Amino acid sequence: FNGMEDENIAQAIPNAKASEWMEENIPLFECPQRNFEEMYYYRWWSLRKHIKETPVGYGMTEFLVQRSYSDKYNLIACAIGHHIYESRWLRDPKYLDQIIHTWYRGNDGGPMNKMNKFSSWNADAVLARYMVDADKDFMLDMKENLEAEYQRWECTNRLQNGLYWQGDVQDGMEESISGGRKKKYARPTINSYMSVSYTHLRAHE
């Protein structure tokens, strides 16, 4: 994979260390279908490119190039849930521990400024991570932060009928015929996220 590109942007784990890092951190996979194996390892090779060292710990970027709408350290909240789901398989927990802490506590102890710009299923992702590593202490330590995130959505995106609204782009869906950037439509996605978040948070009271 390293030979496919001129590595013009390197972050915490450069191409030169990719093979060693993958061998130490990811679940190794083998199957008779060569191209399937190749896709599997390419995904991990790509994921580690987005692990970034910040002044407050590791973060994970969505784009390697700087984006004008990003938060501190070029982080974008849209993919947090994906990043947690993908990274929960890493053997060394420091990467995902710090990535989560950077989002929720990396802004002078509080959440990143643009964390609520995109829909969130982070409570479900944190629980899914626990299902892999069984680190109950970490999960419960995050509960207060996840509760606060849930309440922020209650304040900003709840309609009078009890449902939640979201715009297309802020829902991570780009543009669609069913929505818009400024319309307050009660989309199935954010309502399912909020329902699952509520269920998970109440289950650990």
Give the ranges of each region predicted by the language model.
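Conserved small/polar residues in nucleotide/adenosyl-binding loops
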Residues: T199-E205
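Acidic/His metal-coordination segments adjacent to aromatic residues that form catalytic metal sites
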Residues: V65, W103-P111, V169-A186
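Conserved, charged catalytic cores of large soluble enzymes
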Residues: V196
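Proline-centered turn/helix-capping motifs that create local helix->coil transitions or kinks
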Residues: I51-V56, R91, E154-G167
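Short, contiguous, pocket-lining structural segments
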Residues: L75, K114, K182-Y193
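Substrate-binding groove/exosite segments of carbohydrate-active enzymes
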Residues: E7-D141
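Active-site cavity-forming subdomains of large catalytic enzyme subunits
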Residues: N145-N157
